[in-house]
Regions:
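Phosphate-binding site of ATP-dependent enzymes
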Residues: 294, 299-388
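Internal helical hairpin/lid segments
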Residues: 368-414
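Active-site nucleotide/adenylate-binding loops and adjacent lid/helix of ATP-dependent enzymes
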Residues: 223-332, 337
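Conserved N-proximal alpha/beta basic substrate-recognition cap immediately N-terminal to
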Residues: 150-266, 423
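C-terminal active-site "lid" helix and adjoining low-complexity regulatory extension at the edge
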Residues: 155, 396-424, 428-435, 442-480
C-alpha cells in the first residue's frame, strides 16, 4: 500500500519536473527570438535570474527581464509581486462588497463572480462598480457589452473633443490636428489629454519629449513598486492613519466604527471636521462640517450614515497660506522614491526626494486637489520658495491668486524644510518603499501629514513649467 502511494508521489514529482522543463524550454526559445541570444546563453540567463531572485522562466520571458541589469531585476520582480497583491486586494474588496449587498455567503459569492467573469470577461473592479451582483446573471453579457460600448464611445468622443479644442486654439484643420497629435503620441508616448493640457501644439519635438508624462510616471511606479506589506495600508485611509498617526497630530476616527458618545468626546475641542471616503481619491466625496457641543450629535448621525470613511479634525493652516488662498487647506505634495534592495541614486541613497509642489485652492472648494479645480506651483527643494506661477488643469496660468490677488511666484512656504524632514523621518522609521506622494499641511506649529498616495501622477511636476515651455523629465530620468 505504502509502495503504491510512494510510486504515485514520485510520478507526480516527475510530471511536475517535466512540466517545468517544458515551460522553461518555451521561455528559452521565446527569449532567443527576442534577443538573438543562442540557446545555451538564454538558458543560462534565465536560470541565473531564477536562482538569484526567484523569477520563473515564464515571468522572465513575459516581462522581458533580459532588458534589465541584474542589479535591477529583483526590484522589478518585487514590483510584479506588488501588482499581483493589488489585484488580490481588489478581488477581496469585490467579494466582500457583493456579500454585504446581497447577503450571500463567500462560497456562493465567489461562484457568482467567477461565472460572470467567464461569461463576460468582466474585471473585479467593474463587477463592484456596476453592481453586477444585483443584476440577473442572464443579463450580464448584454449589460457588460453595453458598458464596453459606452466606454469606447466616450473615449472616441473625448478624443474628438480634444481634437476640436486643438483646432480652435491653433487654426489647424481637423485632419492636421489629428495627424500632429498622433505623431506626438508616436514620438513621445503622450496621451491625447496630455497633448492638450501641456500645450504640445506650442512645443517643438525635443521639448515634447522632455515633458514628464503619464507613461514616464508609470515606468517609475512599476520599477519602484510598493512592498507588499505596505499595499494594503496605503490603499486604505484608516490603515494609513493608524500606521502614521504620529505625524497626523490630530484626532480622527472611522465613521462606522465609533459610538456617538466617543465621537462627541473625541471632537470636543474641534470646531470643524472633515469626512473622507476610505477608498476615495482626488478629493472626491470629501465633506466638511462645523461642529459644536450643540450640534455634535446631529453631525454624528449624518456622518455615521455615509459610506465607510475617516473623519478627522479639520486642519487650521498657517496664516500665510490662508492669506494666499483661504477657501481650502493648501497642501504640499512631496514626491519620494525609495527602495530597500538597491540605491535609487548614484550616490548610494535608498530614499530620495524627487520634487515638491504646492497645491492651492482655486476658488470656493474645500479641497485643493488639482483635479478638483485647484492650482499647482513648483517648490524649490532648497529654499521652499515657489519658483513658478500657478497653473490649473485647463492650462490657465496665474501670476496672482484669482480670489486674493496674492503674488504666487516667490512665495515662501512656511516650515518647508521641516516638512521634508518629516517625510525622511517617516521613511527611516517605516522603511516604506516605492514611488510615493506625501500630502502635507502646514499649521502655525509646523507640518502635519494629510495622506500618502501610491503612484503620484506626472501633472503636478509638469504643469507649472508648461507656460515657460520647459520639460521636467530631466529631473526624473535618474529614476527611470
Amino acid at each position: 500500500m505504502f509502495n503504491f502511494f510512494n510510486k504515485r508521489k514520485k510520478n507526480s514529482e516527475k510530471n511536475k519536473k517535466s512540466r517545468e522543463a517544458i515551460l522553461k524550454e518555451k521561455a528559452v526559445i521565446s527569449v532567443m527570438k527576442k534577443t538573438g541570444w543562442d540557446y545555451d546563453y538564454a538558458s543560462k540567463k534565465i536560470t541565473e535570474a531564477g536562482e538569484r531572485v526567484g523569477i520563473s522562466p515564464a515571468t522572465y520571458d513575459k516581462n522581458d527581464f533580459f532588458r534589465f541589469p541584474e542589479a535591477e531585476q529583483e526590484l522589478r520582480y518585487r514590483g510584479i509581486i506588488a501588482r499581483k497583491e493589488r489585484k488580490r486586494l481588489t478581488k477581496e474588496k469585490t467579494i466582500e462588497s457583493a456579500m454585504q449587498k446581497t447577503g450571500w455567503n463567500r462560497e456562493h459569492t465567489v461562484e457568482q463572480i467567477n461565472e460572470t467573469r467567464k461569461i463576460t470577461g468582466i474585471t473585479y473592479r467593474d463587477y463592484e462598480k456596476y453592481n453586477f451582483c444585483m443584476i440577473p446573471v442572464e443579463d450580464h453579457k448584454q449589460r457588460y457589452d453595453e458598458i464596453l460600448m459606452d466606454r469606447k464611445r466616450e473615449k472616441k468622443e473625448s478624443r474628438q473633443k480634444i481634437i476640436s479644442e486643438v483646432v480652435k486654439i491653433t487654426g489647424w484643420s481637423e485632419e492636421t490636428a489629428k495627424e500632429k497629435i498622433e505623431l506626438a503620441r508616436a514620438h513621445t508616448g503622450c496621451a491625447y489629454k496630455e497633448y492638450l493640457i501641456y500645450k504640445f501644439y506650442d512645443l517643438d519635438e525635443d521639448v515634447q519629449k522632455d515633458v514628464f508624462k503619464i507613461c514616464d510616471s508609470k515606468e517609475i511606479a512599476e520599477k519602484y513598486d510598493v512592498n507588499n506589506r505596505f499595499i494594503t495600508m496605503l490603499c486604505n485611509k484608516e490603515l494609513t492613519n493608524s500606521c502614521f498617526s504620529k505625524y497626523m497630530k490630530r484626532p480622527w476616527c472611522v465613521n462606522t466604527k465609533i459610538s456617538m458618545d466617543t465621537f462627541i468626546e473625541l471632537f470636543s475641542n474641534s470646531v470643524r471636521i472633515i469626512y473622507k471616503p476610505l477608498d476615495g481619491n482626488r478629493g472626491r466625496g470629501v465633506e466638511a462640517f462645523d461642529i459644536s457641543e450643540e450640534n455634535a450629535a446631529e453631525v454624528y448621525e449624518m456622518i455615521s450614515g455615509f459610506p465607510e470613511g475617516v473623519v478627522e479634525q479639520y486642519v487650521d493652516q498657517h496664516h500665510e497660506l490662508s492669506d494666499l488662498a483661504p477657501s481650502s487647506v493648501n497642501t504640499i505634495r512631496i514626491v519620494s522614491v525609495s527602495s530597500e534592495t538597491q540605491p535609487v541614486t548614484n550616490d548610494g541613497k535608498h530614499m530620495d526626494i524627487a520634487y515638491a509642489a504646492l497645491r492651492i485652492g482655486g476658488g470656493e472648494s474645500i479641497v485643493d486637489n488639482f483635479h478638483s479645480g485647484g492650482m499647482v506651483a513648483a517648490i524649490d527643494l532648497e529654499t521652499g520658495k515657489l519658483v513658478t506661477d500657478a497653473a490649473d488643469m485647463q492650462g490657465n496660468v496665474f501670476s496672482r491668486h484669482p480670489v486674493t490677488g496674492k503674488t504666487i511666484k516667490g512665495f515662501t512656504v512656511p516650515f518647508f524644510s521641516e516638512a521634508v524632514d518629516m517625510v525622511k523621518q517617516a521613511y527611516e522609521e517605516s522603511h516604506i518603499e516605492g514611488y510615493l506622494g506625501w500630502d502635507i499641511a502646514i499649521t502655525e506649529n509646523g507640518p502635519v501629514l494629510i495622506e500618502i498616495n501610491l503612484r503620484p501622477g506626472a501633472v503636478l511636476l509638469s504643469m507649472p513649467y508648461i507656460s515657460e515651455k520647459i520639460g521636467m523629465k530631466k529631473i526624473m530620468e535618474k529614476y527611470l
